[in-house]
Amino acid sequence: MRTDWVAKRKNDPIRTQMHYARKGIITEEMHYIAKRESISPELIRSEVARGRMIIPANVNHANLEPMCIGVASKCKINSNIGNSSVVSDIAGELEKLEYSVKYGADTVMDLSTGGDIPAIRKAIIGASPIPIGTVPIYEALSRVRRVEDLSAQVMLEVIEEQAEQGVDYMTIHAGILVQHIPLTTKRVTGIVSRGGSILAEWMVKNHKQNFLYECFEDICKILQKHDVSFSLGDGLRPGSIADASDAAQFAELKTLGELTQVAWKHDVQTMIEGPGHIPMDQIEMQVIKEKELCFEAPFYTLGPLVTDIAPGYDHITSAIGAAMIGWYGASMLCYVTPKEHLGLPNREDVKAGIIAYKIAAHAADIARHRPGVRDRDDALSRARYRFDWKEQFALSLDPETARSMHDETLPEDGFKDAHFCSMCGPKFCSMNISAKVESFTADDAAAVLSGAAPESLVNIE
């Protein structure tokens, strides 16, 4: 799709969507997204120009279908895939990608930490019509013997190679600083971000400042060259509700705001990663704080989980928080699967996480009154009231599951026309009963109250 669009800009010195937006140019990607979002191309351009929206679209990701992340558009969801040092299988990761696209993920992050990481990433990018994100420090760590052997040079090489492959956005943990580490020592769960913990160990062992912070402008130049977006990582996000909204989290967030302005100076699109584990009463404050400290850059949050007591069900504990934070203004929600805190998710875990987060993001969009976002809900409700089972299945987020649950007790095709399900049966179905009184008017009600003869009232068969 984008091959011709990108080719005609090949001689432009800067090719980021933010650069064009600031020049007043509405790109083909912006026009395409405007149709997908049912908003004007000029609004897309304006939001990208001011940094309140990003279009993660590496110039090297030719088969990408452009999308946007920002408060003026629909709330998006991300699916995490990728292998581990224990389990590595390209075919399995491509299957997870297929599930992610099928069930509605807007972006996918490849978080592979083992095996042939570049080969896995190449396969994923080549197969993906949606933006791909990565955390480059994982691959960088695989190239050195010890954490303390990491360096700016190794990281810059990895970032350049990933950008050339077509990665659309990268998580860079440049906001965790050496002076922040003492703020984490009294936490219940310490530093739970993999990237954050790696960099904390590096700083302590080398007695130096975070090299990602110190070479940040060099990273900006690479990302600008390929139009890769920053996803500024929250290396100090709280990993338990006991640690929510603490000094460490907000010290890093302030630094992320400063780095956002540096990235914008280079016309590099930027979003901010957020928590984590947050009690419900602190969620709105988290959004307000991010907008204030990070100049309204899009907020991309992991959950947040609103309680810590449900391993195996954290797609639910986090979807509750995700719906709330999406309503309050987060632009993208990173899914959590049932396997969170327990193990590497398989494709069914990926599906469960995506469905939970599609629900959360859609609920947030309804609450934010996005134009047309409720149309599907209303259509399904009308089909439900008509007992149009096939239409209900077709309109649902997961038609296969909806159909299989219905058919578990009423499998015969004849029941697809029935005016009841196995929950209530024909006698107690409220909608079936309600349909019988539809012709009862306000005049009929007044007649009842005035004591009119029964024969003069509407007759229900």
Curated annotation (Swiss-Prot):
Q: How is the cofactor bound?
A: Binds 1 [4Fe-4S] cluster per subunit. The cluster is coordinated with 3 cysteines and an exchangeable S-adenosyl-L-methionine.
One GO process term, biological-process aspect: thiamine biosynthetic process
Q: Which Gene3D superfamilies match?
A: 6.10.250.620, Radical SAM ThiC family, central domain
Pathway(s) the chain acts in: Cofactor biosynthesis; thiamine diphosphate biosynthesis
Chain residues that bind Zn(2+): 277, 341
Q: Which cofactor does it need?
A: [4Fe-4S] cluster
Q: Which UniProt keywords apply?
A: 4Fe-4S, Iron, Iron-sulfur, Lyase, Metal-binding, S-adenosyl-L-methionine, Thiamine biosynthesis, Zinc
Cross-referenced Pfam families: ThiC_Rad_SAM (PF01964)
EC no. given is: 4.1.99.17
Q: In which domain of life is the source organism classified?
A: Bacteria
What is the recorded name of this protein? Phosphomethylpyrimidine synthase
- Which lineage ranks, top first, belong to the organism behind this chain? Bacteria, Pseudomonadati, Acidobacteriota, Terriglobia, Bryobacterales
Q: Which gene encodes it?
A: thiC
